[in-house]
């Protein structure tokens, strides 16, 4: 009896020492680090045991209890955007058993979450874009060993009739006629009315030295034209989608980054009335220092009034308005919405509401949030797609398709492209918390 008691106490002491046990909580549980290797093993086991098709996104809370091994009580989020409270028993032999799984329903506005691919032929991806074509959805991103490396190419995937996504296809690269090679950047897909699909992207060593190129597809992204270099001083949409105005003009939101120190970041707009054959552009709309702004998105405020919002160096989302369909623009200003110097995107819905997808933080690229506005001035919080400390969920793209649903893609930890479908009719709001 004494021997049994001694062994039990010894095991208890070893477990406490090895797992950094904190003061006991109710039920004999103690707090555990969500980054602890055994906690993560238990969480991954729980997800696969519950549904082999799911993957663990992150653990948000962890407790542990030493009872003939260790019980881990975990709060976690899975790849279908659902949360769960689980208990996993790690036995004395080191194996795991899932003893409890309690799903917490995802927000009813989130209809689908998925990855465009499981694994790709590149270590990193970034800068997604998505568009609806007459034959279905098409998405693109850049991928390679790392951003800025010469092997970074533009990849395209199409949603097939069965809802699955085609394998990503290398569609553009930075190989030059003399054999040299530059990285590609920031693809932007756009479907003009009654015209071929357009793929804009940048080629060059850096944002201050790159140039714009354009490819088109007459079959919904299956095949593509040769690359066309845009005219000197024209870059196409720098990150976010263009809009087609009532007169048929395509208005591209763009920006410039100088190679000075500090770099001046300034926005402007380009316009084509003939599908990219000829172009005009505004001048830079501000000095790029007091407010350093890039990567605008365009919203429709009614009539010829437009608004652009986007990324800054000043930890706030910028805004600027036009009263004449983008020919001239007012003064740029900062909103109350935080921005960690990371890309955003926005769209005006068919019902007139505006959606902004962005990182609601002044630092880091998590969480990833959706905000709603009726007038482009007052914003309310709606959804949180991702919220994992010290991870990256960034550079989103957002569109509304003809069926009224909202489609979103974004960089998931620089490893995958994530696609989320939202029903805007089911969105609820609450005050923003800064």
Spans of features found by a protein language model:
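Compositionally biased, intrinsically disordered low-complexity regions enriched in proline and serine
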Residues: 7, 30, 51, 59, ...
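Positively charged n-region of N-terminal signal peptides that target proteins for export
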Residues: 1-5
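Bacterial N-terminal signal peptides
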Residues: 7-15
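N- and C-terminal low-complexity/disordered segments
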Residues: 19-108
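Asp-box/BNR beta-propeller blade signature and adjacent active/binding-site loops
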Residues: 107-434
């Amino acid at each position: 009896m004494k021997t049994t008691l001694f062994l039990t106490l010894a095991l208890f002491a070893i477990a406490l020492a090895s797992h950094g046990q904190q003061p006991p909580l109710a039920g004999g549980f103690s707090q555990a680090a969500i980054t602890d290797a055994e906690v993560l093993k238990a969480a991954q086991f729980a997800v696969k045991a519950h549904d082999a098709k799911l993957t663990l996104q992150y653990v948000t809370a962890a407790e542990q209890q030493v009872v003939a091994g260790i019980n881990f009580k975990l709060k976690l989020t899975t790849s279908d955007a659902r949360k769960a409270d689980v208990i996993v028993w790690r036995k004395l032999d080191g194996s795991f058993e899932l003893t409890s799984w309690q799903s917490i329903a995802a927000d009813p506005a989130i209809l689908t979450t998925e990855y465009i691919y499981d694994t790709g032929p590149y270590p990193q991806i970034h800068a997604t874009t998505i568009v609806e074509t007459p034959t279905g959805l098409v998405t693109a991103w850049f991928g390679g060993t790392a951003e800025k490396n010469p092997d970074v190419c533009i990849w395209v995937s199409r949603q097939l009739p069965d809802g699955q996504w085609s394998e990503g296809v290398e569609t553009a690269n930075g190989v030059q006629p003399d054999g040299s090679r530059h990285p590609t950047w920031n693809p932007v897909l756009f479907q003009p009315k009654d015209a071929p699909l357009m793929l804009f992207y940048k080629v060059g060593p850096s944002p201050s030295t790159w140039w714009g190129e354009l490819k088109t597809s007459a079959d919904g992204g299956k095949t593509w034209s040769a690359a066309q270099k845009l005219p000197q001083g024209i870059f196409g949409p720098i990150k976010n989608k263009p809009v087609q105005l009532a007169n048929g003009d395509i208005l591209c939101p763009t920006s410039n980054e100088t190679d000075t120190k500090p770099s001046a970041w300034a926005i402007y707009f380009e316009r084509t009335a003939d599908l990219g054959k000829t172009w005009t552009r505004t001048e830079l709309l501000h000095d790029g220092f007091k407010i350093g702004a890039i990567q605008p998105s365009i919203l429709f405020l009614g009539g010829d009034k437009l608004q652009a919002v986007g990324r800054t160096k000043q930890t706030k989302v910028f805004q600027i308005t036009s009263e004449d369909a983008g020919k001239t623009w007012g003064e740029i200003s900062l909103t109350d919405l935080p921005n960690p110097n990371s890309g955003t995107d926005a769209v005006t819905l068919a019902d007139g509401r505006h959606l902004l997808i962005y990182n609601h933080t002044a630092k880091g690229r998590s969480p990833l949030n959706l905000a709603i506005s009726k007038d482009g001035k007052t914003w309310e919080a709606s959804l949180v797609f991702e919220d994992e400390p010290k991870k990256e969920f960034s550079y989103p793209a957002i569109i509304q398709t003809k069926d009224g649903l909202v489609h979103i893609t974004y960089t998931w930890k620089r490893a995958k492209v994530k696609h989320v479908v939202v029903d805007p009719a089911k969105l609820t709001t609450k005050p923003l918390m800064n």
